[in-house]
């Protein structure tokens, strides 16, 4: 069940507002469609536009009257479950609520929740580790700390906050307890991106950044014959591109590269050969691959272009330079200077 009202205060009409290239609710519907455990997907809404979007995705729509917004999600779930039972649903069937305001939740989280229910969980909730130095107030207003020692956040004990992204139980458990939160409870920990719940425009701005950031892979090495210039340039590029999903790829036997990047906070992946790099690129499907390891072969670059939107190579005198989307080199002047938006 994806409950989606037409009205919202913090971000007006947020469920139909376009995030990147599609309405916000489409992100969650597509995640649900990608869940192997999802047999029936229902968008519960009071809004014609939301209903139309859901129908275009091919999922079921259940309508409700416009409310004051004081209705709880358990109230909505009660209506949907009542209808499902009339249509032949069984008490053992999993019932999963997925919030449309959590656009980065992954479909496999729904599948994971259903599997946990099959294995005896009463409820399954997605949570994010939100440990901080927190305070509360006593009944008389006196501040009280909720920690024992003032230490760095990473050293505090885990403290989990519900994301609201996924809450799962069975129809039978809901009938018996009249709530979606039933013991024994299992927690599925997600990262900060999946945990994002859009309430205000500040959240929306974060969502726009997450939706539009690029995936970048830098292939580089250092060594006695190669020197260190390549890794220093890769470091400069990495620092400029750090706001994107960045991965530095080095050879497993390149000890100098390993030691160099161990001093810096970037994700480094080691590969054994070109085949391993191709396999990594095929799985990652990056927006951009940057090559900085001298002369490349034409077939090498052509293979990488099958997996990436663009391939850029540096100081490359090999045949692969002709196949790359862009060559950056101080070794010679361009015979034809390409300028303008199409070449940026």
Predicted feature residues:
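Short phosphate-binding loop-to-helix
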Residues: 42, 48-96, 104-112, 272-284, ...
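N-terminal nucleotide-binding beta1-loop-alpha1 segment
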Residues: 1-12
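Conserved core of the sugar-phosphate nucleotidyltransferase
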Residues: 73-79, 102-191
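Active-site and donor-binding regions of nucleotide-sugar-utilizing enzymes
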Residues: 223-225, 233, 239-240, 251-338
